[in-house]
UniProtKB/Swiss-Prot annotation:
Example GO molecular function: four-way junction helicase activity
Residue ranges, annotated region (Domain II): 65-139
Residues spanning the membrane: none
Biological classification of the source: Bacteria, Pseudomonadati, Pseudomonadota, Betaproteobacteria, Burkholderiales
GO biological processes: DNA recombination; DNA repair
Gene: ruvA
Organism annotation: Polynucleobacter necessarius subsp. necessarius (strain STIR1)
UniProt region (Flexible linker), positions on chain: 139-143
Keywords: Cytoplasm, DNA damage, DNA recombination, DNA repair, DNA-binding
Name the UniProt record assigns to this protein: Holliday junction branch migration complex subunit RuvA
Location within or outside the cell: Cytoplasm
Length: 193
């Protein structure tokens, strides 16, 4: 449908923006993380979008990054999580924090988001496990660091540690560590735990 919108930012009324594209103005709902990255009104912007058609409304949601949009799409697939709740989650925590909370099964972190209760948080942890990029939040975002952390994670899993234990150990390893040093540091951390 509508995958991207490019135009002039007319106004901002959180969480809604008004974007003018060739004389047509679109209302776009965005998470706070995207809102913080916006330029001043009157400037050009580009947003990745998700277009949702329901029997009573048509809505356009905008995101600064592909990871935000993909996280939103994964969230709205979950029973009981609508677009407003998904926006609240992405406004209350970054995609990296969400991925970490899901990977570590920390429902308590999710309940800190307004509108997310204990049951919804547990459902999010259960249904999103393995669906968000596993490297998010583990490394600083550098391709080599992500590859290294992925290798270290796989090695710790192959050695019989649970995903939760391996991810906790991975958090203790600096991003610029080599694979062999990372495995060694991870094993050292896990032997103390």
């Amino acid at each position: 449908m509508i995958g991207r919108i490019q135009g002039t930012l007319v106004s901002v009324h959180p969480p809604r923006l008004l974007v003018d594209c060739q004389g047509i103005s679109y209302e776009v709902d965005v998470p706070m993380s995207t809102l913080y990255q916006l330029p001043q009104a009157g400037q050009k912007i580009t947003l990745l979008t998700h277009f949702q058609v329901r029997e009573d409304a048509q809505q356009l949601f905008g995101f600064a990054t592909e990871t935000e949009r993909e996280a939103f799409r994964q969230l709205i697939k979950i029973s009981g999580v609508g677009s407003r709740t998904a926006l609240a989650v992405l406004s209350g925590m970054s995609v990296n924090e969400l991925a970490q909370a899901i990977a570590l099964q920390e429902a308590g972190r999710l309940t800190q988001v307004p509108g997310i209760g204990k049951r919804t948080a547990e459902r999010l942890c259960l249904e999103l496990k393995g669906k968000l990029a596993p490297d998010l939040g583990v490394a600083g975002g550098k391709p080599q660091a992500i590859e290294t952390s992925s290798e270290v994670l796989q090695a710790l899993l192959a050695l019989g540690y649970s995903e939760k234990e391996a991810l906790l150990a991975l958090k203790q390893i600096p991003a610029d560590t080599s694979i062999s040093d990372g495995i060694r540091m991870g094993l050292k951390y896990l032997s103390k735990a």
